[in-house]
Amino acid sequence: MTMRTSSLLLAAVAVVAIVAGATAATVGSWEPVDINDPHVQELGRWAVAEEDRGVAAGGLTFERVTDGEKQVVAGVNYRLTLEASSSGAKDGRYEAVVYEQDPRSNARKLVSFEPIH
């Protein structure tokens, strides 16, 4: 192997190691989401509808996602702060955690949905 080939090979290995290290650091950590992304707003709308389905009184209406984070795991966890209103009550803020296994298949699970006091 020539010196030039060895240097190129070493540089390529270094680049791969840096990229792999950067990717590994982000897996599992929470990162902000763009609340203006239509997909994020759809996840918030879905979370409210899913929660409303399980509540006897019902009447919860999605307003908007105001903040959020995502966590890449075997799929993606979304922790969303959202506003919703209910019939006969004042508007409220809620935190919803939605697990989305694959955005293309709409395989979702509402992990939690809690009012923010």
From Swiss-Prot:
Endpoints of the signal sequence: 1-24
Domain of life: Eukaryota
Any one of the GO CC terms: extracellular region
Keyword set, alphabetical order: Plant defense, Protease inhibitor, Secreted, Signal, Thiol protease inhibitor
Record-linked InterPro entries: Cystatin, Cystatin_dom, Cystatin_sf, Prot_inh_cystat_CS
UniProt GO MF annotations: cysteine-type endopeptidase inhibitor activity
SUPFAM superfamilies listed in its UniProt record: Cystatin/monellin
GO biological process, one term: defense response
Short sequence motif Secondary area of contact: positions: 71-75
Location in or out of the cell: Secreted
One Pfam family, short name: SQAPI
Residue numbers marked as site, Reactive site: 28
Record keyword Signal present: yes
Domain called Cystatin: residue spans: 28-84
Stated role: Specific inhibitor of cysteine proteinases. Probably involved in the regulation of endogenous processes and in defense against pests and pathogens.
Family: Belongs to the cystatin family. Phytocystatin subfamily.
Protein name from the UniProt record: Putative cysteine proteinase inhibitor 7
